[in-house]
Amino acid sequence: MPGDKVTARRILKMKGSRPIVAVTAYDYPTAWIADEAGVDVILVGDSLGMVVLGYPSTLQVTLDDMVRHTAAVARAAKRPLIVADMPFGSYEPSSSAAVESAVALARVGAEAVKLEGGSEYADRVKAIVDAGIPVMGHLGLTPQRAMRIGGYRPRARGRDEARRLLLDAESLVEAGVFSIVLEFVSEEAAEMVTRRVPVPTICIGSGRRCDGQIIVFHDIVGLSRHTPPFAKKYVDARRIMVEAVTRYAEDVRNGRFPGEEHVVHAKEPLEDIS
């Protein structure tokens, strides 16, 4: 039923049934809107570094940042599954560090965590799952490691990269993930992985053959400075908001705001107060 709480187990069971709808959101108002729209998953992404905090990349995002924004999203959204990104440096040092970071996110409302990387981090995935926290994998273009793996370019367009993608996906499944995000890989490679693994795949810029799709909230509504080519802008909210603030500024400068309807009056005369 649409009103039922979405869990990691429910997402797992959705593979092959109906498309999973996921949105990346970062704060109370965007999460509240996404929940009202009926999405299945809200990802509190470390992309908040660029989208919300103005950083040049995700590398500047800290665990404290993720905890703060995850808590805000969790206060707003009640039905969707809330997944929190594990930021750069929060799980790489050791499995114990990974569990500690995941627990910090779970304590403020994350119902699952997402981490980037393949077989090299399978032990971190297993440790977090063994601690009782569901894990979503992330393969293909992994922004935290984009420079190391050749920059922001499409992945798995050739056989060797596609084979590596599949092996990493299988490794994550063995470690216990309940789903895998495939970012900016060829549609054919995404389709192959989707067919070959038993967990749902959720695409971002990876074509139409996955079990679900995810886009950043700000890209959907037109609030991003730069919309990626694989995203679709459904409304130009930036233009609407600029127009609204411009009208407000004009009203203040011309004495039209506040109006009588915005004013609170005293209950008795105040002129003779000394």
Swiss-Prot record:
Reaction(s) the record says it catalyses: 3-methyl-2-oxobutanoate + (6R)-5,10-methylene-5,6,7,8-tetrahydrofolate + H2O = 2-dehydropantoate + (6S)-5,6,7,8-tetrahydrofolate
Co-factor binding details: Binds 1 Mg(2+) ion per subunit.
Active site: E183
Major location (coarse): cytoplasm
GO BP term, pick one: pantothenate biosynthetic process
Binding site for 3-methyl-2-oxobutanoate: D46, S47, D85, K114
Listed Pfam families: Pantoate_transf (PF02548)
Named cofactor requirement(s): Mg(2+)
Residues reported to bind Mg(2+): D46, D85, E116
Keyword Transport among record annotations: no
Cellular component aspect of the GO annotation: cytoplasm
Key words of the record: Coenzyme A biosynthesis, Cytoplasm, Magnesium, Metal-binding, Transferase
GO molecular function annotation: 3-methyl-2-oxobutanoate hydroxymethyltransferase activity; magnesium ion binding
Entry EC number(s): 2.1.2.11
HAMAP family to which the protein is assigned, alphabetical: PanB
Function: Catalyzes the reversible reaction in which hydroxymethyl group from 5,10-methylenetetrahydrofolate is transferred onto alpha-ketoisovalerate to form ketopantoate.
Protein name: 3-methyl-2-oxobutanoate hydroxymethyltransferase
Species name: Aeropyrum pernix (strain ATCC 700893 / DSM 11879 / JCM 9820 / NBRC 100138 / K1)
